[in-house]
Amino acid sequence: AGVSAQQLRPGYVTPPSSSMLHKYVNDWVPGQELTTNYGDNGESSAWEDEEFFVSRVALKPHFVNLNTQIDKTKSDTDNKRLLFWVPINESTGVNGEWLNALPNAVFDSEVFSTWSYVTHYGNWTSPFGWVPGAMADAAHKNGVLVSGLASIPNAYLSSNWANCLAGMSAMNSDEGVKKLGNFLRYHGVDGLGYNSEYFGGGSYGEGLRGMHGKLVKYMKQYQPAFENVWYGGTNDAGSVNFNDQLSSDFYQTFGYSDEPRTILFLNYNWNSTYKLSQDASGITATGRDPRDLYMGMNMQGGLKTATEWAQHLTLPYSIGLWGAHSVNYIWINRAVNGSSDASKQATYQRDLEYWFTNGKRNPLHVMSPVNSLTATSEFMGMSRYMEARSTLSWELGTEPFVSFFNVGNGAFYNWKGEQLHVGPWYNLGVQDYMPNWRYWIATEYLGTTPAEGVDAKITWDDAYMGGSCLRITADNSGTAYLHLFKTEFEAKNNTKLTIRYKVLKGNADMSLVWSKLGSESTEAQGNYGKVFDKDGKTYSSTKPDGDVDYDADWQSKTITMTSRNKLAGTISAIGLKFENAEGLDILIGEISLTNGSYTTPTAPTVTRAKVLANNYKGIDGKVYYKMANTKEVGEPVYNLDVKTSLFRLWSRTDVDPTPKFLGTTTSWAGMIFSAPATGASKVQFGVSAVSLDYANESDIAWSEEMSTGDYVAVEDVKVSKNPVTTNEDFYVEFVDPAHAPVDWQIKDESGNVVASASSATRIDIADGLANTGSYDVVTGSGENAVERKGVISVSDPG
C-alpha cells in the first residue's frame, strides 16, 4: 500500500479526546508525562504526543498607553474585546489526519496573525481543555487567551459528555480546582470553552458552575486573564434557551462580580430593544464588566448584519465571531485570487487585514458599518470598534525584542539570509511579532491623516529568517510614516536598535523613527534614524558613508542609544519614515531592540525519537527533548526560563554525518519532514537551542541511531499539462520515481473508462481526450486500487 505526499499523516500525532478531559486531569501527576490516551467511549491506549499540546510561552499582559492609540479618548474600559471562536486551519486532512495547528510540511496552512485585534481565540476544533502548543505560543506572546472546545452535540447529553461534565463538576473543591488549574497552566490553556446547546446536566450543573468560578479565581493568581466561554444556549436549569440575551436564567452560569464564572457568547438574534434592555439589567444585577458579554456574529451569514454592526458602535458589550464548524470563513475563501500556495497565503493575510483592520488596511480610515460578513475592501473592520493592543513592554536585559516578520510558514527556510532548507513548512509557534496596526500609515508621526502612495504587506518571496518578511512599496513625493510597533521598552545606555533591509528598486529618504514615553508625538531619533537617502547613500550614523546595494543583499543599520546622544529613554512606538519616495520597493527582514548580550542556552536532552515514514522525499519522524531548568516540579517551564528563543531541528545519517537543517519549533517536541536519507540505513534526529537574540546556539543534541525503515511508495500523481485541452496529448505519472509499475485507468464523470495502461509507471494519452470535463485517475487493481477524483481537467482550446 502507498501513502500520500510528505506531510502530516494519520498516526503522526494523536490528539487527546475532547470528552475525556476529566480523565486526563485525574491521571496527571506533576512532573510526569501523560502516557495514556482515551477514545470517546473511554477505551485507553498508549500515548506519546502530550508535548505537542504544551505551550512554552507565557501569556504576556497587554499594556495601555492612550497617547499611542489612534483614538486617544478611548480608555481601556471602553476598548471592546473580541472572541474569535472559530477553527484554525483545516480540521482534518485528505486522509482523515487531525491537522488543526500542528506543525506540518504544507505551505498553504493557516498562519493567523492579526492578534492585536483579538483577546481570546477559542479554537473550535481543538479538544476540550487542550490547544496545540504551537498555536498557544503564538497567541500568548501577543497576550491572547486560547481555549479548546467541549464540542457537545445539539441534543440530549450523550453518555461520554454526561460523564465528562459530571467529572468536571466533581472538581468543585479547592483541591480539585487546584489540580485542574495546574493542569491547564502547565499545558498553556487559558479557559474552558463550551458549545453549550444541550439538554440535561442539571444534576451536576451547580457543581460545574461553582468549579468555573473557583477556577477563574485560582488562575488569575498566575496570569493576567483567564476566561471560560459559554455559548448562550444551555441555561442554569440545563434547558436550551436561545433567547439571545442575558436573562436571569443565565445569571448563575455567567457569575457575579465577586465570582465571575464565564464570558457569555449570545446567539445571533440579540438586536432588539427588549433583549438589549435585558442585557443592561443583567449586567447591573450581576455587577459584571459589560465587556464580558459577547454579542454573537455568525460569519456564515444568513442573518441581518448592517444594523448589528452599527449597533456595536453604541453598545458597551464585546464582539463574538463564530463560523463555522470545521473551517473558518476567512481561511476558506483564500483561493479567489489564484490557486498557488503563495497566492492563497497572500489573499488570506489581506483578508485578515480587511476583517480586523478594515478594507483600506489602515485603521485611520473610519469606515461606515456595512451589510456584510465578508472580507472586502468596503468592510469597516474590527479596528472600528477597538484599539490595537500590544504586549511589547518588558525588560530588554532579560528578553530582547526581535521580529523578522516571519509569519510561520513558507516554501523555504532562510537562516540569517542564507537559504538552508527548500520545501514547504508550517509552524505557527515560530511566528514573529507582527505590526500592531496593520497598517497605520499617516502623513505625520502618530498622525490621523492617512498617507497615500505607501503600502505594506507580508511576502514569501524572500526572508532574512524563516519563510517571509515585510515588503513595503512607496511612491510619494511627500512624507509618510508607517507605524510598526506600539512599545514600552526602556532603552538604557548601549541599547541597540537594528533594522535589516533589502532594497529591490527605487529610492527614497528612509529613516527609523521612534518617540519616548511622555512625549509620544515627538520624533526622538534626530539625525540618527536615517537609514538611506534618495541619492542611494546609506547611513551608519548621522552622515552618508556607503551605498545602497541593489544586488539583492541584506543590509543593516544599528543605532546605539545612550544618554550622551539623548536617545536613551522609554520607547513608546517604532516606525519608518519615507520622504521623496520614487518607485521604492523594499524588504524589511528585521527590527530588533537588544540590551547587552544574552546567554547561550544549554543543549537539550533528547528523550526519544521515532521514524514515521521513508519515501522518495526522505524520512519523516519526530523527536522529543527536555531542557534543564530550576522550576518546581509541575510548574510550567517556558523557553524564556531556559534562555531560548526557539529550537532548530536537524538530521544526519550513517552515510552522510553532516547535520542537515530541517526547520524550527518552539515546542519541546519536533516534527521531522523529508530528512535526506539517500542510500542510508540509519538516521539520527537532532535539536539545538537558539539564544534569545538569535546570536548563538547550543550544541546539537542527537537521538540514538534508528533504522530508516522500509521504503513506502507515494501514491500521488501529476499531470504533464494543466489545464489540458481537448484532443491534446498529455500523460499522467507518479511523483515517486521509485514507484513500481501498476495498471492505470482514466474515467470520465460517468465512470466510463476512456483510457488504460498495464504495468506502467505512467499513462500516455497520445491523442488526448475528446470531451471537456473532469476525469478521475485510478492506479492499481482490486484491494490495492487507488482512485483520485478530478485529477485531470479538460477544456476547449479557445
Task: List the predicted regions and their residue ranges.
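Short carbohydrate-recognition loop motifs
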Residues: G453-Y481
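Extracellular beta-strand ligand-recognition surfaces/modules
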Residues: I499, D553-I591
